[in-house]
Structure formats: C-alpha cells, structure tokens
Amino acid sequence: MDFANERRAMIDLLVQRGIRDRRVLDAMAQVPRHAFVPENERSFAYSDQALPIGEGQTISQPYMVALMVEALQLAPTDRVLEVGAGSGYAAAVLSRIVAKVHTVECREALAERAVALIQALGYTNITVHIGDGTQGLPDYAPFDAILVSAASPWVPAPLREQLASSGRLVIPVGGRQAQILLRLRREGDTLRTERLCDVRFVPLIGGHAWTAERYPER
C-alpha cells in the first residue's frame, strides 16, 4: 500500500474540512499514522475514522486530532501535557510543533507500546508517563497547553491548576454518549471557557474523572 499517497490524501481532506494551521498540517504530513495502528487496521490508517488499538481504546480520527491540536494555538517553545497517550500518535503530532511533550497513559500495556514506538521512530522530545492522567504531572507543571484525549464528566481540577498563564486546555466534557469539546484559556486568575463542537470520545478514567464506581453501567 502506498502510505505516502494515502497520507497526502488525508491532508487534503483535513484542508477541505477547515483545518488552516499550516504547522498542524505539516506535522500530520510527517507522522506515519499507519505505524500507530494494529497491522490488521493499516489499510484504514489514513481514512478519517477512529480505529481500535486494543485495551478497549481507539486512535482518534485524523480530523479530530487536527482540530484539537489546532485549537491549542501552539507556539514552538510550548511545553505540552497530553492526558491519554493511547497509541502515541497525537503526542507524535504535537512533538513536531512544540519544544516538549509529556503524555500520560493509565494502561500500562498501551504506555509501553507507545514508548517503544516513539523511540523506534526517533521522537526525542516526548516523555511517556504511566499513571492517572487526571492528576496531571505536578512535578513538571505548569504547562503552556494541555490536551485531553478522552472524555471527562468535568474539567479535572489538577489540570486547571497546572495550566500556565495564558495557557490553553482542550478537553471533551459531558456524559457517556456525547460530549462538548471545550477550550479553556487562563487569563490572570480566571479561566475563560469556549464551546468548540459536539464530539464523542472514550471515557477518561481516573480519580478526577470517571471511576469504576462512577462510570454509568452499560
């Protein structure tokens, strides 16, 4: 399969769907999404859809990754926290735009797989942490931007607290079936919140989001 042509077609689709930040488009043109999906899903790697990656998790559709990264309004010197590393794909995209990416994954198997892949692909400005991403990473805070790649019933307090002055936080917030993508921006002592669009994500599991006790039964 000609992944290079498939990737170019994906970028063309992102432009058609309204992605305008050239840095985001260039980053996604550089990162081999097919490397981040299971071998049996690789023929769909550059289609605009979420794909299973194991452990009940998915790699987000390319448009959603582009939309969320664009919404962060990143600068080259930014330090970014991603909550929900998953396959490591979004962290790889972020790493092509900013100085440093910290990404947290609560599922050890996914985290270990992401570490191996990130190292194999030569991304040197990404650190993968295993743990509860809803706690953030206080030892590395504050962050210029925080991207949450799973849905929470609310904005976790530790993430709000770890946002730098003028920092941006993009997160899906809502119930089990549907959420709203929010962007929060720190302005002095306040956080200004914008509603971006309706979305549907896998649940964010952790002490400050969904837990086994809190998460609604099927």
From Swiss-Prot:
One Pfam family it belongs to: PCMT
GO cellular component: cytoplasm
Gene3D superfamilies (alphabetical): Vaccinia Virus protein VP39
Cellular compartment(s): Cytoplasm
The name this protein goes by in its record: Protein-L-isoaspartate O-methyltransferase
Known catalytic reactions: [protein]-L-isoaspartate + S-adenosyl-L-methionine = [protein]-L-isoaspartate alpha-methyl ester + S-adenosyl-L-homocysteine
Superkingdom of the source species: Bacteria
Enzyme class of the recorded protein, top EC level: transferase
PROSITE patterns: PCMT
Enzyme Commission no: 2.1.1.77
Originating species: Roseiflexus sp. (strain RS-1)
Gene designation per UniProt: pcm
Function according to Swiss-Prot or TrEMBL: Catalyzes the methyl esterification of L-isoaspartyl residues in peptides and proteins that result from spontaneous decomposition of normal L-aspartyl and L-asparaginyl residues. It plays a role in the repair and/or degradation of damaged proteins.
Keyword Methyltransferase annotated: yes
Alphabetic keyword roster: Cytoplasm, Methyltransferase, S-adenosyl-L-methionine, Transferase
